[in-house]
Regions:
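Nucleotide-sugar donor-binding catalytic core of glycosyltransferases
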Residues: 1-115, 119-140, 166-174
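A charged, aromatic-enriched C-terminal amphipathic alpha-helix characteristic of glycosyltransferases
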Residues: 153-175
Length: 175
């Protein structure tokens, strides 16, 4: 009876069933549309003092129609920079220059964008769910919103304070 079930996109609280564990996606692998080349991450990540005190928004709406609303809201926010990227390497480099990044769900609840953000010391911004609460219990730094509309009420001062709060956890990388 001593066994555990590991699952990606686990949207059931691990508090309710101790035999369940969330299994993170991680970054894309090279067999996944040839996007996951590790050399996309080989460059000097900007020091946290030089990162933009904004939220990076760069995602398409093809994988999940809920993203259309997230994109609309992000364009209304004063602290979100919406960008399109020409290729994967440029996307990762741009991502690394921001303190925060919007990480809406993809085909499932998890998204590679979440893990790519952490690799370049950018805080993922996510919408709360049982899945996100499972990740929170793993001590992963993230900004959790109850509703994407909250993006319109966050100030740059809020972002600065939140980044400083999460920075030790982000630098330690013990998650």
């Amino acid at each position: 009876e001593n066994f555990k079930w590991f699952a990606s996109n686990l949207n059931v609280s691990t508090l309710k069933d101790k035999k369940l564990e969330v299994l993170p996606f991680g970054i894309k692998n090279k067999n996944n549309l040839m996007d996951g080349r590790i050399n996309s991450f080989i460059f000097d990540i900007p020091h946290h003092d030089r990162k933009k005190n904004k939220i990076y928004s760069s995602f398409n709406t093809l994988k999940n129609k809920d993203r259309i609303n997230v994109l609309r809201i992000s364009k209304e926010s004063k602290v979100v920079d919406s960008k399109n990227y020409a290729n994967r390497k440029n996307y990762i480099r741009n991502l690394s220059t921001y303190k925060f990044s919007i990480c809406p769900s993809g085909k499932g609840l998890d998204t590679h964008r979440f893990w790519e953000s952490l690799i370049v010391k950018t805080i993922p911004v996510v919408k709360n769910s049982d899945f996100i609460e499972n990740l929170s219990r793993l001590n992963i730094p993230m900004l959790v919103l109850e509703d994407w509309e909250e993006l319109c009420y966050i100030s740059e001062d809020n972002l600065s304070n939140l980044y400083e709060k999460y920075l030790p956890q982000l630098n330690e990388g013990d998650y």
